[in-house]
């Protein structure tokens, strides 16, 4: 009997304490399954966006049994030492459960603080997202459109100014070509005038030579006239001397009139001839001199006209040269201005393209930042849902533990062998068999990467 009592005692102890963790685990699984409205548990992963779904397949009610071993002696009571051991074990379990409850409460408080901080961050991110969506893009778009309109207006103005400058440049080029043609004509006329002037100078030189020749001839004739006058006077003197020295004595009254008349005739003839020669010489000299003077005056007039034309042509050439230099300076200034306009246009175009690229990069950065905020918001929502589910699960676990702790202990002193035998018969029904399916889904950016399913039997 003592051996049977010991066997019953060990069976009761094993059924009371060794099966307890299994029953508690079963109860926790039941609460876990009932905690989620869909019958699933969402377990978040810290390394990646990972969501696990735990779906119970079959669950049957678990009966709380404190004893399943038969009692040999139905009329005798249980040993009170067993009750003391159970009470001490119960106190230890209560202490452990109290510590576990404190730890769970601390974890729950930490989770609630984390949820509050995440909700505040979520609100801040939502406000920032609304601000970025509502204000920043529209402001950037308006600034972009306004600056683009200003740049287009500047481009149109620069294009119009460039066209005007090109037209002015073409007109100046045409004027310059005309002036060059006119200058060429003037140069040709100048060369012709210089050739005519050279010919006139040759004529003037010839006229001067002819005048000098005539002057020499006039001087020669004048010398010849003077010589003839001297010779005539000497002949007259000789004749007078011969007449005085004559041996013939003739009467002066008879002979003198004849000689005087002859001398007078000779003198008159000689005077006539001399006067005639002088007159002819003077007329010839005057005519030659008049011709030479006329020719010289004509040559002088032609030379003066040629000089005037030459001076006029020189002044025209100088004025045209000055005008060409001025046009060249204007053309160079316009070319520099056009180059400056083109450089400024290219620089403004480059700045506009840089601004457009910067705005596009900023818009792309804002879009990426919005996408990142949305992803963070989605992840935070997922974490919040997981935390809500876990908090609900812990709440259900706490309620279940409180209900289990508040349940009254069975009176071992009044247990009979029949009760023990009655409780031992449905032992197979008390062993709960449960299949748990753990479905793990990995997501990244809202897309499903992988999905795994694991089955566990209890």
Swiss-Prot record:
InterPro entries: IF_conserved (IPR018039), IF_rod_dom (IPR039008), Intermed_filament_DNA-bd (IPR006821), Intermediate_filament (IPR050405), Keratin_I (IPR002957). This is Type III intermediate filament. Residues 406-458 are annotated as: Tail. Keywords: Coiled coil, Intermediate filament. It comes from the Eukaryota. It holds the Pfam family Filament. It comes from Tetronarce californica (Pacific electric ray). One of its GO terms (biological process) is intermediate filament organization. One of its GO terms (molecular function) is structural constituent of cytoskeleton. Belongs to the intermediate filament family. Residues 1-100 are annotated as: Head. SMART domains: Filament. Residues 97-405 form the IF rod domain. GO terms for cellular component: cytoplasm; intermediate filament. Disulfide bonds: none annotated.
């Amino acid at each position: 009997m003592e051996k049977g009592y010991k066997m019953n005692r060990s069976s009761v102890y094993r059924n009371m304490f060794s099966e307890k963790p299994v029953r508690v685990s079963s109860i926790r699984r039941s609460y876990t399954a009932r905690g989620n409205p869909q019958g699933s548990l969402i377990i978040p992963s810290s390394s990646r966006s990972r969501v696990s779904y735990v779906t119970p397949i079959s669950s049957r009610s678990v009966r709380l049994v404190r004893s399943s071993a038969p009692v040999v002696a139905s009329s005798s009571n249980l040993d009170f030492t067993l009750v003391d051991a159970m009470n001490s074990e119960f106190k230890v379990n209560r202490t452990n459960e109290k510590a576990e409850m404190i730890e769970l409460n601390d974890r729950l408080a930490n989770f609630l603080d984390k949820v509050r901080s995440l909700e505040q961050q979520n609100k801040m991110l939502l406000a920032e997202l609304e601000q970025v969506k509502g204000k920043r893009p529209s402001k950037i778009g308006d600034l972009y459109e306004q600056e683009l309109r200003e740049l287009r207006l500047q481009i149109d103005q620069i294009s119009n100014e460039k066209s005007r400058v090109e037209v002015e440049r073409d007109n100046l080029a045409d004027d310059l070509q005309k002036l060059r043609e006119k200058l060429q004509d003037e140069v040709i006329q100048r060369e012709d005038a210089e050739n005519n002037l050279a010919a006139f100078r040759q004529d003037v030189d010839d006229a001067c030579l002819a005048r000098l020749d005539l002057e020499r001839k006039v001087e020669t004739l004048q010398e010849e006239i003077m010589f003839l006058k001297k010779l005539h006077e000497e002949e007259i003197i000789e004749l007078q001397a011969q007449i005085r020295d004559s041996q013939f004595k003739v009467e002066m009254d008879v002979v003198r009139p004849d000689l005087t008349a002859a001398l007078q005739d000779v003198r008159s003839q000689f005077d006539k001839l001399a006067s005639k020669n002088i007159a002819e010489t003077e007329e010839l000299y005057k005519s030659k001199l008049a011709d030479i003077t006329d020719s010289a005056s004509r040559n002088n007039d032609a030379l003066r006209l040629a000089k005037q034309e030459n001076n006029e042509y020189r002044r025209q050439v100088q004025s045209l040269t000055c005008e060409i230099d001025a046009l060249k300076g204007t053309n160079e200034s316009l070319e520099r201005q056009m180059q400056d306009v083109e450089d400024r246009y290219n620089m403004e175009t480059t700045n506009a393209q840089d601004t457009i690229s910067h705005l596009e990069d900023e818009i792309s950065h804002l879009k990426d930042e919005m996408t990142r905020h949305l992803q963070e918001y989605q992840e935070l929502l997922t974490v919040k849902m997981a935390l809500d589910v876990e908090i609900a699960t812990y709440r259900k676990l706490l309620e279940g533990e409180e209900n289990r702790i508040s349940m009254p202990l069975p009176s071992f002193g009044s247990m009979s062998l029949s009760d023990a035998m009655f409780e031992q018969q449905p032992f197979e029904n008390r062993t709960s068999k449960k299949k748990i399916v753990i479905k793990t889904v990995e997501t990244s950016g809202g897309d499903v990467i992988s999905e795994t399913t694991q089955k566990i039997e209890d």
